Structure formats: C-alpha cells, structure tokens
C-alpha cells in the first residue's frame, strides 16, 4: 500500500491521496521500501486541551484561551480548572472524548481507554519480534511507576531489579517507533542549538496521552471530585504529562538536570526566536521555584515560565501561566 503512493504521485498527480497507518514508523525501520520524495508526512496526536474544550461544546471558552486575554481567562478560572480535571481523566483519544462529550460517563470512558490499551498489547505481540515482546511489555507496564518518581529520569531498574540499558534499548525504540511514547532528553548544557547538547543516556519517557496514563495507573474517577487531588496524583505525574502533551504539538522539548546538583528544569524549549526558554511545572499553587530562579540567573534567560494553578502573572524574571 505504501509503495502505491509513488504511482499516484507520478501517474495520477490530479488525485489527492491520504493514507493512514498506526505502525508506519516500525515498518520503515524494518527496511520496507518507501517512495522517497513522493509523500508528505503529517503526524496526528491526541486532542489538545483546547480541542477538548471545543469538543465539550465550550467554543467560546476555547476562543478565550486562544486569545490570551488573561484578565478574562482568570474570571473563568474555576470553569477552566473543572475542564482541566476532566481532560486529565478523559485525555485526548478521540473515541474517549466523543463518549464523554455525549454521556459524561466516567466508566464508559475508562472502558474505552482500557480497550485501547489492550489493542496496544495485541499490537506488541503481533508486530514486534517475538524475542523482545516480553521486554516491550515489561517496559510499557513500568511507565506509571517511572513517572510517579520524584525524579522522573528513566531508570531501567524500575522495570525489574538488575535491568540494564542494553537489554531494553530495542524495546524502547519499538515503543517510540509505534508512537506510544515520547522521549525527552536531558541536555548537558543549556546552549544553542539544544539538539547538539542532548545527553542520549539521560531521558524521561512519557506516554502518548494523559488519559491513558490514568487508565494504566487505575486512577479512580473519584479523584475528579476530590478537590484538586488529581493535579497532584503520583507526585504530579499527570500534570507533567499534560504539559508535555501540549508542548509536543509545537516544540521538541528537552529538560535540564545540572550535574552534581539538585537543580532541575522540567522542560527546556528552543523557541522561534532561538531563545532557550525554561519551564517549571507545579502541580499545585505552591510555586516556589528555586531551580528556575537559579537557572535564569546563571544563564541570563530572557524568558522563563512557571506552569501552575495560580492566575496569570508576569513578574520581572518569570511569567506564571
């Protein structure tokens, strides 16, 4: 099917052909022939928070978010926080969003998410080399525990005691090629371009969707109505996953852990103006940001952002969003 696209490009250019495939990355890595230069790629991701708000029928609120009219946004903060709780639980997988928009039924949403996770397990067994299927499965199941650590750097020993990188590198690559995980590298130094300083041995792993992470972790729907506890579950794992999910739509995020120090910046971005922008993620309204302030001081950062439940505020060295 993939090779037929070359025919359409060369012999039937008047037709616009769209082809979809969930495991295309794996096929290409396995040496399948591909019509180079004949195909444009478009990566699809789970629905963003703004798209979720629109799917809930709140188009005016979605437009308000896009407008960045912060004074108005602050007035509707309780409503946005309610929708954000819903998004943490439902996530952005289209079928889960559709069912929730129609029924507001938490159990039906979870049933769909569990079905998606089961289909991923079947894909692992069907499409991955048989000798690495157990390692792929073990690695995949370890991700909630990886993200619930205080330090979210990926540790092979969390998969099983004594596990080593060489045993799981291929399994990790398979999950990445399948589009089931995002890999966020540490940078050895916060310098431009960030890609030149990435540390290939130090990274965080996130799953593709915050709702699926909740399903993998058996998060109960009761956390939705229990104050703001959903924002702090698993040491803020859902919050960091949520932020990553929005960033990945536009940027290639990194993070920075200063050597021989406790200083860590949750995400580093290289923006359109070639500025290095540090982001710190806070799951609550407690926004003490010692690491972020130190980073801004050391690197003379022009921009810095802190993501929290607090209202928008622009200070002299940081913007709270």
Indicate residue ranges for each PLM-predicted region.
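Conserved nucleotide-binding/hydrolysis micro-motifs of P-loop NTPases
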Residues: 22-27, 46-50, 188, 212-213, ...
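Interdomain motor-coupling "hinge/lid" segment immediately C-terminal to the ATP-binding subdomain
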Residues: 22, 28-148
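Conserved catalytic network of the ASCE P-loop NTPase/AAA+ motor domain
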Residues: 8-15, 33-37, 270-271
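Structural motif
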Residues: 275-277, 303
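Accessory nucleic acid-recognition modules appended to NTPase machines
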Residues: 93, 98-271
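Terminal-proximal interaction/regulatory segments of ATP-powered molecular machines
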Residues: 277-283
């Amino acid at each position: 099917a993939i090779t037929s696209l070359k025919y359409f490009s060369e012999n039937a250019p008047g037709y616009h052909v769209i082809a979809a495939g969930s495991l295309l990355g794996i096929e290409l890595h396995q040496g399948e022939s591909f019509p180079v230069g004949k195909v444009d790629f478009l990566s699809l991701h789970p629905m963003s928070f703004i798209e979720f708000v629109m799917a809930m029928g709140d188009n005016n609120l979605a437009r308000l978010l896009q407008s960045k009219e912060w004074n108005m946004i602050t007035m509707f903060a309780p409503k946005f926080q309610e929708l954000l709780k819903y998004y943490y639980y439902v996530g952005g997988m289209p079928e889960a969003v559709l069912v929730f928009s129609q029924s507001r039924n938490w159990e039906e949403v979870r049933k769909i998410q569990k079905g998606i996770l089961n289909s991923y397990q079947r894909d692992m067994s069907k499409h991955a080399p048989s000798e690495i299927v157990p390692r792929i499965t073990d690695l995949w199941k370890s991700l909630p525990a990886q993200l619930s650590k205080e330090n979210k750097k990926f540790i092979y020993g969390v998969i099983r005691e004594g596990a080593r990188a060489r045993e799981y590198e291929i399994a990790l690559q398979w999950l990445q090629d399948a589009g089931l995980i995002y890999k966020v590298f540490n940078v050895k130094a916060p310098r431009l371009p960030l890609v030149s300083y990435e540390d290939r041995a130090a990274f965080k792993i996130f799953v593709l969707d915050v709702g699926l992470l909740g399903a993998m972790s058996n998060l109960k729907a009761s956390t939705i109505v229990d104050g703001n506890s959903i924002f702090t579950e698993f040491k803020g794992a859902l919050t960091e996953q949520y932020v990553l999910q929005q960033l990945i739509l536009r940027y290639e995020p990194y993070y920075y852990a200063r050597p021989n120090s406790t200083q860590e910046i949750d995400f580093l971005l290289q923006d359109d103006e070639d500025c290095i922008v540090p982001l710190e993620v806070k799951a609550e309204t407690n926004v003490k940001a010692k690491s972020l302030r130190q980073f801004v001081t050391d690197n003379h950062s022009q921009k810095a952002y802190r993501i929290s439940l607090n209202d928008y505020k622009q200070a002299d060295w940081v913007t709270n969003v």
